[in-house]
Curated annotation (Swiss-Prot):
This is Small ribosomal subunit protein uS13. One of its GO terms (cellular component) is cytosol. HAMAP family: Ribosomal_uS13 (MF_01315). InterPro entries: Rbsml_uS13_C, Ribosomal_uS13, Ribosomal_uS13-like_H2TH, Ribosomal_uS13_bac-type, Ribosomal_uS13_CS. Gene3D superfamilies: 1.10.8.50, 30s ribosomal protein s13, domain 2. Part of the 30S ribosomal subunit. Forms a loose heterodimer with protein S19. Forms two bridges to the 50S subunit in the 70S ribosome. It comes from Streptomyces griseus subsp. griseus (strain JCM 4626 / CBS 651.72 / NBRC 13350 / KCC S-0626 / ISP 5235). Located at the top of the head of the 30S subunit, it contacts several helices of the 16S rRNA. In the 70S ribosome it contacts the 23S rRNA (bridge B1a) and protein L5 of the 50S subunit (bridge B1b), connecting the 2 subunits; these bridges are implicated in subunit movement. Contacts the tRNAs in the A and P-sites. Keywords: Ribonucleoprotein, Ribosomal protein, RNA-binding, rRNA-binding, tRNA-binding.
Amino acid sequence: MARVSGVDIPREKRVEVALTYVFGIGRTRSKEILASTGVNPNTRVRDLAEEDLVKIREHVDANLRTEGDLRREVQANIRRKVEIGCYQGIRHRRGLPVHGQRTSTNARTRKGPRRAIAGKKKPGKK
């Protein structure tokens, strides 16, 4: 199995798709990497020459923040917003949606499962 940034990328997939298994690399970034290294995006990982793999590895390590470094940076940014008490930091602290979504209904992923309210009855059918 080929490794890029400490991640095993699947051998059977096309290089363009396989690179997206690395945190911080999506389809667009993957296409940019392959264009700059001169590797055909339709090649399967198993068919890649070792020199192509080395080119991709060096490009990713030299030019991109991926995996652990990127995760640490994202967490540091969130922590900083929480500490300075800005609106987004408050939303993170309370476990609510950060990007302006409605919360009257929906937002169950951020808020977690519904909690029953004591004494409140569901409206019955008439």
